[in-house]
From Swiss-Prot:
Lineage: Eukaryota, Metazoa, Chordata, Craniata, Vertebrata
Function noted in UniProt: The IFNLR1/IL10RB dimer is a receptor for the cytokine ligands IFNL2 and IFNL3 and mediates their antiviral activity. The ligand/receptor complex stimulate the activation of the JAK/STAT signaling pathway leading to the expression of IFN-stimulated genes (ISG), which contribute to the antiviral state. Determines the cell type specificity of the lambda interferon action. Shows a more restricted pattern of expression in the epithelial tissues thereby limiting responses to lambda interferons primarily to epithelial cells of the respiratory, gastrointestinal, and reproductive tracts.
Protein's organism: Gallus gallus (Chicken)
Cytoplasmic side: 251-567
Protein name in UniProt: Interferon lambda receptor 1
Gene from which the chain derives: IFNLR1
TM regions (residue ranges): 230-250
Length: 567
């Protein structure tokens, strides 16, 4: 090549070099930095740069030095920064970048940055807290403002919980990015605040700043709720008050109501003799006695018996005072079974009247009374409280004779129980033997004594049943034709065989520790020592009856016979 040609080329190069450098100055302050989980290259335009200047960026890693790789999204850009976060091939290797300015046909030289490692030099941003409030619990999780390419790194967050105005904060640390935290807020009342920060562990834990506090009311409505447990006693109290009010209103309404006239029995009086009875603690009435002057038919006797038992009943509770009485109770443990069959008796030749005698012991109101029978009417025993009549039927005695007639009956009355266990009516032969006797007696053996101060109050002209030594004596005078029969205690009984008679047999059972006064009006009551309480057994022995009781109603032709219980 000739010398002049070399000189021309050198001159042209000299002239061209100063002109280019004068048009595009290089970028200034080229820096590689990390901000909010990103790695960014930043710079500033050179002095005298035209407004339409463009910038191009490329990087190299320390493992492959002198091999610059262009960044696609940072080529001919107008901005003065380039995000290299997702361009970095490895987050654990250091790298650097360079940039130049271009304008038309002119460009500036490359300006390089320092080396940086993402995992060590990254700067973290505070996370965004998501608080989901539910009843008595809250759910807390965090959202990180980062690029998708770096989500695989082990990001964590911490958050604090505290009551507004208080410095006491409860910390929740090292919670992984996708994990939510559940907090029980049952005990929390009022305004509570939350804040959080992100963290990553490299050589040491690296933390971001705390986010701005997020405050909210926890259990705000619960402060004004009425506790459910308190409603139970209130409900019970309301029920009690309502019940008491209803009961009080019913009582007040009942006071203003009057008893119906049909149920008012205060003005009713029972016709017939008055019964006076002074009850003690061990006495109460359970039986009623009705006396009739007519024999009852066979079909009506059971009905009448039930009605009488329902109307007026007297029960006396016996008490044992000795071992002998207890043995008698066990021996006589069976109950009475009364005979209910009745004979039809004639209505003639019987009447009831009450002449007086001088026997003071058997007199009501210090006067005596007797039962007399007058022909032409039926004997009225209602004044003595008798209502049932015994059966009279022919029976064969032990010797085979049929001359004697036997009747036995027992029943409860208001004064107790009277029992005539053995009664024999004299036959025609016996009647002839004792025809001269004018007095007949009916023998009654009492199994129990009457109650003290219990008697039948009769009119002045009627006789009162009385007690002496625990036995009753009912005597009557029987006429031969039309003459009245005197009631007495004579042991003989004269009976007209042409007359059919009735004898009322009744059982009297009272408390064994009570006596009976013969005079209801005198107020003087005699206390007796009663025999032991006994009950009829299946068979009553005559010897036992004679040992226990002395006084008896006797009539002519009387004989003992065993009482057989009806099955």
């Amino acid at each position: 090549m000739s010398a002049w040609r070399i000189r021309v080329l050198a001159t042209l190069c000299f002239l061209w070099q100063p002109r280019v450098h004068g048009q595009l100055p290089p970028p200034q302050n080229v820096t590689l930095l990390s901000k909010d989980f990103d790695m960014i290259l930043t710079w500033t335009p050179g002095e005298g740069s035209p407004p339409d200047v463009l910038y191009t960026v490329r990087y190299e890693s320390k493992t492959r030095m002198d091999k610059w790789i262009k960044v696609p999204h940072c080529r001919n850009i107008h901005s003065v920064s380039c995000n290299l976060t997702c361009v970095i091939p490895n987050f654990f290797i250091k790298f650097r970048a360079q940039v130049k300015a271009t304008s038309g046909r002119f460009h500036s030289p490359w300006v390089k940055s320092q080396f940086k490692e993402y995992h060590l030099d990254v700067e973290l941003a505070p996370p965004l807290l998501n608080v989901n409030v539910k009843e008595n619990v809250i759910h807390v999780n965090a959202t990180f403002p980062m690029a998708i390419c770096v989500e695989s790194l082990p990001w964590m967050y911490d958050f604090n919980l505290w009551e507004a105005g208080s410095e006491d904060k409860k910390q929740y640390k090292s919670i992984f990015r996708k994990k939510a935290v559940t907090i029980d807020t049952t005990a929390l009342r009022g305004n509570y605040c939350f804040n959080a920060r992100s963290s990553i562990q490299s050589i040491d834990f690296k933390h971001s700043k705390f986010s701005q506090p997020v405050c909210m009311q926890l259990n705000y409505e619960g402060e004004w709720k009425f506790p459910f447990s308190a409603t139970i006693p209130v409900f019970v109290l309301l029920i009690l008050l309502t019940s008491a009010s209803i009961i009080w209103l019913l009582k007040q309404d009942a006071k203003h109501k009057k008893m119906p006239q049909t149920l008012d029995l205060s003005n009713c009086k029972i016709a017939g003799p008055t019964f006076c009875c002074e009850l003690r603690e061990n006495e109460f009435l359970t039986d009623c006695l009705i006396c009739t002057d007519k024999p009852m038919s066979q079909g009506k006797k059971n009905k009448t018996l039930a009605q009488n038992n329902q109307m007026w009943m007297a029960s006396f509770l016996p008490s044992s005072s000795s071992e002998e009485e207890e043995e008698e109770e066990e021996e006589d443990s069976s109950s009475f079974i009364p005979y209910t069959e009745m004979l039809q008796f004639p209505r003639k030749h019987f009447n009831f009247q009450t002449p007086r005698t001088a026997d003071a012991e058997t007199i009501l109101d210090s006067t005596s009374g007797v039962l007399s029978v007058v022909g032409g009417s039926t004997l009225d025993l209602s004044a003595l409280g008798f209502s049932f009549f015994p059966i009279r039927k022919n029976e064969m005695d032990t010797s085979g004779s049929q001359g004697n007639e036997k009747a036995s009956h027992s029943h409860s009355s208001s004064l107790g129980r009277i029992s005539l266990t053995d009664v024999r009516f004299p036959g025609p032969r016996e009647h002839g033997q004792h025809g001269t006797d004018s007095n007949d007696c009916l023998e009654v053996s009492l199994l129990h004594t009457l109650m003290n101060s219990s008697c039948t109050r009769l009119p002045a002209d009627e006789h009162c049943l009385y007690k002496k030594d625990h036995d009753f004596t009912i005597c009557y005078q029987k006429p031969t034709l039309d003459q009245p029969v005197q009631v007495s205690e004579n042991p003989l009984l004269n009976e007209d065989p042409s007359m059919e008679k009735f004898i009322y047999l009744q059982t009297l059972q009272v408390a064994e520790d009570e006596g009976f006064a013969s005079d209801c009006d005198s107020g003087n009551f005699t206390e007796g020592t009663p025999p032991a309480s006994t009950v009829l057994s299946d068979e009553l022995r005559i010897s036992d009856m004679e040992k226990r009781y002395d006084k008896k109603f006797k009539f002519k032709g009387y004989q003992h016979s065993h009482y057989m219980r009806r099955s």
